[in-house]
C-alpha cells in the first residue's frame, strides 16, 4: 500500500527565533552574494517573475542572458516571483547559475505537485477533506533540498536569506481568509521559512492543499482562527510592481510604525497606488504568454523577440494541428464581418432581428459571392440557411441564434471579442487552472500601466501553454532558447549608446 505523504496543509507561522545557520563552509553550493560589481551598463537591481505554469522553464534562458550581460547575479539585490515564478525567484535570490537551475529543476514540473496516493478517488477525497488533491509534500521537500544545498538550511527564513545571500526575496501569496494579497518578505515575515512562502505561492487551488498558518499565540490559546493561503497568481500574477513605492522598502523612513500612522486612516493605504508608487526603474520584470494567448505585453515585443524554430515533438505537433483549425476559422472572419455589416444595413425595422426577406436581400445584393455564402453557411439556398439558423422556429432569427450558428461553423465570436481562445476544462485541475487564469488575467490587464513597458521583457513560449505538461527535453530546450532570445532582444533595444 502506497504511503500517504505527511500532511503539510497545517503549518505553524512561528514568531520564535529561528535556528542558527550552519557555517557557510559546510554548504554544498555556496551562494553568490551581490556586490554591485557586475560589468554592465544596465541599472537593474531587481527581478520580477510572473506566474505561468509550464511556461516558466523559459526563465532559465532569460537568466542565462542576464549572466552573460553581467547583470546577474552580482548586481541583483531584490527578487520577487509569483506561482511558478516564485520558485525561480527563490533560485535567483540564492545567486545560483542558470546551469544549476537547468540541472536541478525537473523537466516535468507538474510531478513535484502530484504526490497524492489512491489515484483519482484518493485525490477527490483529499480535495473534499483538505481542500486539495495533493499534499504538496514532494514540492515542499524539493524546495528544502535546494535551500539546504545553497544556504545550509532547508528552513532558512527571509531574514536569514538576506543575511546569508545578501538579497531581499518577496513572494506574493493569496490569503483566502482575508481575500487579499499578502507579501512574504524580510519586512513583513522575517521569521517565516522561505520554502513555506514559496509552497504557498505555488498552491494551485484544488491541485494542491492550501497552507494554513497560525501564530504561536493562536496555537497556545487553542483558538481555531488559522488563515488559509493559496497561489499568489490568483490576485497578483505579475509582480513587477512589488518593489515600487514604500510598502516593501527597508529604509527606516518607510517603517510600518511610521507609515501606518494614524491607524484610523490606515485603510486609505490599501489601494495599490498608495503603497506601490512611484515605479522603480531598477526593476526588470518578465511576462509569459503562449502563441494562442492575447497578452497585453505581446505588443511590447522588441525586434528580434521571437521563439526559435519548433522541435519535432508531440506537443509541437498537437499545437500545429490546432493552428490549422484556427486558420480555417480566420479565413471565415472577413466574409462573416461583411455579413454582419450587411445584415445591419438590411435590418429595415431596426429591431435587431433578421427576417427571411432581410436575409434574402443581404445575400443577393452583390456583396457576397456564391463561394463566400457556401463557406459561411455550407449552402447557397436562402431558405435552407434561414431554417438552419432559426432554432426556435419563429418568423425571425435572433442575434443569439446567429452567433450560435456561427459557432457551429467554427467561429468563436467570444474569442474574437476578448482575445482568449476557449479552453474547455477536461478535469477538476483544468477547471482550477481556468479559474485562476480568468481572475489573474483580468487583474493583470487592469493593473498593467505605461510605467511597466520599459521595464518588462515579454516572452512568447509559442506552443507551450500554462498546462502543457509531459514535455520532453527538446521542448524544454526550446523554451530556454525562447527565453534567451526575448531577453537578448530587449536588452539590445535598451542598451546605452
Each language-model region and where it sits:
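Patatin-like phospholipase
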Residues: 13-35, 40-48, 53-149, 181, ...
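Short coil/turn segments at secondary-structure boundaries
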Residues: 117-121, 155-161, 209-215
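Extended hydrophobic secondary-structure segments that form protein cores and membrane-embedded regions
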Residues: 46-48, 78-82, 169-172, 229-232, ...
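C-terminal helical/tail subdomains of lipid-metabolizing enzymes
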Residues: 2-6, 12, 236, 288-290, ...
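Active-site periphery "cap/insert" segments of enzyme catalytic domains
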Residues: 140-171, 182
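Intrinsically disordered, low-complexity domain-flanking/linker segments in eukaryotic proteins
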Residues: 251-275
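Active-site gating loop/helix substructures
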Residues: 162-258, 316-327, 461
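Eukaryote-biased recognition of electropositive, low-complexity segments
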Residues: 241, 245-246, 259, 268-271, ...
Amino acid at each position: 500500500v502506497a504511503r500517504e505523504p505527511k500532511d503539510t496543509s497545517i503549518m505553524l507561522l512561528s514568531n520564535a527565533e529561528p535556528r542558527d545557520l550552519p557555517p557557510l563552509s559546510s554548504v554544498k553550493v555556496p551562494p553568490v552574494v551581490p556586490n554591485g560589481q557586475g560589468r554592465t551598463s544596465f541599472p537593474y537591481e531587481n527581478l520580477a517573475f510572473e506566474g505561468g505554469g509550464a511556461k516558466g522553464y523559459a526563465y532559465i534562458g532569460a537568466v542565462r542572458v542576464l549572466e552573460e550581460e553581467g547583470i546577474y547575479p552580482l548586481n541583483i539585490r531584490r527578487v520577487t516571483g509569483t506561482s511558478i515564478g516564485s520558485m525561480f525567484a527563490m533560485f535567483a535570490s540564492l545567486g545560483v547559475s542558470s546551469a544549476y537551475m537547468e540541472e536541478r529543476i525537473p523537466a516535468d514540473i507538474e510531478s513535484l505537485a502530484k504526490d497524492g496516493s489512491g489515484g483519482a478517488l484518493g485525490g477527490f477525497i483529499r480535495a473534499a477533506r483538505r481542500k486539495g488533491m495533493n499534499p504538496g509534500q514532494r514540492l515542499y521537500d524539493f524546495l528544502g533540498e535546494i535551500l539546504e544545498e545553497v544556504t545550509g538550511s532547508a528552513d532558512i527564513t527571509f531574514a536569514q536569506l538576506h543575511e546569508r545571500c545578501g538579497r531581499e526575496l518577496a513572494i506574493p501569496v493569496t490569503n483566502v481568509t482575508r481575500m487579499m494579497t499578502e507579501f512574504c518578505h524580510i519586512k513583513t515575515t522575517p521569521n517565516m521559512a522561505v520554502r513555506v512562502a514559496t509552497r504557498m505561492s505555488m498552491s494551485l487551488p484544488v491541485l494542491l492543499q492550501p497552507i494554513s498558518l497560525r501564530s504561536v499565540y493562536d496555537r497556545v490559546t487553542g483558538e481555531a482562527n488559522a488563515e488559509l493561503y493559496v497561489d499568489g497568481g490568483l490576485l497578483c500574477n505579475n509582480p513587477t510592481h512589488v518593489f515600487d513605492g514604500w510598502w516593501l522598502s527597508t529604509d527606516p523612513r518607510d517603517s510600518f510604525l511610521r507609515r501606518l500612522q494614524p491607524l484610523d486612516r490606515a485603510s486609505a493605504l490599501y489601494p495599490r497606488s498608495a503603497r506601490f508608487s512611484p515605479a522603480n526603474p531598477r526593476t526588470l520584470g518578465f511576462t509569459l504568454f503562449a502563441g494562442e494567448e492575447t497578452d497585453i505585453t505581446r505588443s511590447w515585443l522588441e525586434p528580434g523577440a521571437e521563439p526559435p524554430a519548433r522541435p519535432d515533438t508531440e506537443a509541437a505537433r498537437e499545437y500545429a494541428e490546432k493552428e490549422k483549425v484556427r486558420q480555417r476559422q480566420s479565413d471565415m472572419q472577413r466574409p462573416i464581418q461583411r455579413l454582419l455589416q450587411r445584415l445591419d444595413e438590411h435590418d429595415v425595422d431596426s429591431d435587431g432581428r433578421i427576417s427571411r426577406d432581410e436575409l434574402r436581400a443581404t445575400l443577393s445584393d452583390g456583396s457576397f459571392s456564391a463561394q463566400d455564402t457556401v463557406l459561411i453557411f455550407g449552402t447557397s439556398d436562402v431558405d435552407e440557411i434561414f431554417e438552419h439558423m432559426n432554432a426556435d422556429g419563429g418568423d425571425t432569427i435572433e442575434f443569439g441564434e446567429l452567433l450560435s450558428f456561427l459557432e457551429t461553423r467554427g467561429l468563436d465570436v467570444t474569442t474574437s471579442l476578448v482575445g482568449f481562445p476557449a479552453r474547455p476544462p477536461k478535469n477538476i485541475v483544468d477547471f482550477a487552472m481556468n479559474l485562476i487564469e480568468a481572475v489573474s488575467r483580468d487583474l493583470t490587464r487592469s493593473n498593467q500601466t505605461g510605467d511597466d513597458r520599459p521595464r518588462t521583457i515579454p516572452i512568447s513560449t509559442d506552443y507551450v501553454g500554462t498546462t502543457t505538461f509531459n514535455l520532453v527535453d527538446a521542448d524544454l530546450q526550446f523554451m530556454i532558447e525562447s527565453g534567451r532570445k526575448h531577453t537578448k532582444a530587449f536588452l539590445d533595444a535598451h542598451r546605452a549608446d
